């Protein structure tokens, strides 16, 4: 059977760690606090990524492991208990405290699960304490959200009520829009995970139909399935086509009339196609290489190829769950290479050999590639931007047309001359 060519490689990687997901999770749940147990490097990463002033009162922080902790000369558990209690006394509005593991805390085998259990016993339900790992050891940065949501699944109340559960963080306005559309189609009860208040957890059970909004929530989906929920497999809501198929998957699960679904979605798709037209004029025929970082790469590749007319040189992804991504793989062109994992030097060699018009990559690779004359798009920008849904299809396409327009304005042509020196990442 024809389809994309699935490949795999391993080696040195270039990705952020899962702590980065705290940046959007702490905004999603304003009554929660994320306490990273890690090093000063962890603290600097989150502070820089979130862009919060040092004198502000953010809803995240770092319990910094000292040299004495790392050397085993101090009881890190006692110190962690003290820090948590001081934090909760100072910030009484906190309803849920996430203890977030890091590379350093995992290296010294600090048992945050036991710490959370101990604190829950002492706090007697006043504050819920949960833990998950944001370590970058063998993970990529979006998996931090998967870890956080997976930690909440055992806490969800049980209910067999018929409902649609949207799983994965969306911008509030985008989520409101999707819920409104589902209600117009005929689905009455719609909940979301993560909730907008950490204490307002949705129920789950045999009547729950789960629709993932993000492709990196593998563990969360598995645990929800274990709780009796039905997890749908569908393309993800990026672009007009993917978003429509995503919504139609829910409509089919709830046995909604095709005519009613079409009446809601047809006008939206028509407007989206009109918004896409001016960006397709820039993108059509251009060659794009997607390096692995966010796990959004397959849905993005499908959108860019089918709706924007781009040619896929290679589609990289940090991890590939073939069952969860089956609908996306079915929509990719035959024989396009899909590379799971990363050997960053080998991938950069393939980028240089293929000379694509645009490369989607991490921030650390963007400047070296730009210096070699190759236009780039930061993959992390796609995670922080409101790009989901039919209404956002034009905005999503603009994120890719903009760097090509910029390069045309800076200097003619997208490729360096043969005299340009190679800059190694």
From Swiss-Prot:
Q: Write down how the cofactor binds this protein.
A: Binds 1 [4Fe-4S] cluster per heterodimer. The cluster is bound at the heterodimer interface by residues from both subunits.
Its top-level enzyme class, in one word, is oxidoreductase
- Binding-site list for [4Fe-4S] cluster: 17, 42, 103
* Biological processes, Gene Ontology terms: light-independent chlorophyll biosynthetic process; photosynthesis, dark reaction
Q: Membrane-spanning regions, if any?
A: none
Reactions this protein catalyses: chlorophyllide a + oxidized 2[4Fe-4S]-[ferredoxin] + 2 ADP + 2 phosphate = protochlorophyllide a + reduced 2[4Fe-4S]-[ferredoxin] + 2 ATP + 2 H2O
Q: Provide the alphabetized UniProt keywords.
A: 4Fe-4S, ATP-binding, Chlorophyll biosynthesis, Iron, Iron-sulfur, Metal-binding, Nucleotide-binding, Oxidoreductase, Photosynthesis
Pathway, per UniProt?
A: Porphyrin-containing compound metabolism; chlorophyll biosynthesis (light-independent)
Give the EC number. 1.3.7.7
Gene Ontology terms, MF aspect: 4 iron, 4 sulfur cluster binding; ATP binding; metal ion binding; oxidoreductase activity, acting on iron-sulfur proteins as donors; oxidoreductase activity, acting on the CH-CH group of donors, iron-sulfur protein as acceptor
Name the cofactor(s).
[4Fe-4S] cluster
Function comment: Component of the dark-operative protochlorophyllide reductase (DPOR) that uses Mg-ATP and reduced ferredoxin to reduce ring D of protochlorophyllide (Pchlide) to form chlorophyllide a (Chlide). This reaction is light-independent. The NB-protein (ChlN-ChlB) is the catalytic component of the complex.
Sequence similarity: Belongs to the BchN/ChlN family.
PANTHER family with a match to the protein in the record:
LIGHT-INDEPENDENT PROTOCHLOROPHYLLIDE REDUCTASE SUBUNIT N
* Self-association state and partner proteins as the record states: Protochlorophyllide reductase is composed of three subunits; ChlL, ChlN and ChlB. Forms a heterotetramer of two ChlB and two ChlN subunits.
Provide the protein name.
Light-independent protochlorophyllide reductase subunit N
Upper lineage is: Bacteria, Bacillati, Cyanobacteriota, Cyanophyceae, Synechococcales
């Amino acid at each position: 059977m024809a389809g994309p060519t699935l490949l795999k490689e391993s080696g040195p990687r270039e990705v952020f760690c899962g702590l980065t997901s705290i940046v959007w999770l702490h905004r999603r749940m304003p009554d929660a606090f994320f306490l990273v147990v890690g090093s000063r490097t962890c603290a600097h990463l989150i502070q820089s990524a979130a862009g919060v002033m040092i004198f502000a009162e953010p809803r995240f922080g770092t319990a910094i492991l000292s040299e004495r902790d790392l050397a085993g000369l101090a009881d890190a558990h006692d110190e962690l208990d003290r820090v948590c209690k001081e934090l909760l006394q100072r910030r009484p509005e906190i309803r849920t405290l996430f203890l977030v593991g890091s590379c350093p805390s995992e290296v010294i085998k600090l048992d945050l699960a036991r710490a959370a259990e101990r604190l829950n016993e002492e706090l007697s339900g006043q504050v819920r304490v949960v833990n998950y790992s944001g370590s970058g050891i063998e993970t990529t940065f979006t998996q931090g959200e998967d870890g956080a949501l997976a930690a909440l699944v055992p806490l969800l109340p049980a209910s067999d009520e018929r409902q649609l559960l949207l799983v994965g963080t969306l911008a509030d306005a985008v989520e409101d829009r999707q819920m409104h559309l589902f209600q117009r189609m005929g689905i009455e009860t719609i909940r979301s995970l993560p909730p907008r208040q950490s204490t307002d957890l949705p129920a789950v059970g045999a009547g729950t139909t789960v629709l993932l909004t993000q492709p990196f929530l593998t563990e969360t989906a598995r645990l929800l399935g274990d709780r009796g929920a039905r997890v749908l497999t569908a393309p993800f809501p990026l672009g007009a086509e993917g978003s429509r198929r995503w919504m139609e998957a829910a409509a089919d699960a709830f046995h909604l009339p095709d005519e009613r679904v079409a009446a809601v979605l047809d006008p939206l798709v028509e407007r989206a196609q009109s918004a896409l037209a001016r960006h397709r004029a820039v993108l059509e025929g251009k060659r794009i290489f997607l390096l692995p970082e966010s796990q959004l790469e397959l849905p993005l590749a499908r959108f860019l190829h089918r709706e924007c007319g781009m040619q896929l040189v290679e589609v990289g992804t940090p991890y590939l769950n073939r069952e969860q991504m089956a609908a996306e793989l079915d929509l990719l062109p035959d024989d396009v290479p899909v590379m799971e994992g990363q050997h960053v030097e080998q991938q950069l060699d393939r980028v240089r050999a293929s000379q694509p018009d645009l490369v989607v990559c991490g921030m650390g690779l963007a400047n070296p590639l730009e210096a070699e004359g190759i236009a780039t798009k930061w993959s992390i920008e796609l995670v922080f931007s409101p790009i989901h849904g039919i209404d956002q299809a034009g905005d999503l396409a603009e994120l890719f047309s903009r760097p090509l327009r910029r390069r045309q304005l800076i200097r003619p042509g997208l490729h360096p001359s043969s005299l340009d020196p190679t800059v190694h990442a």
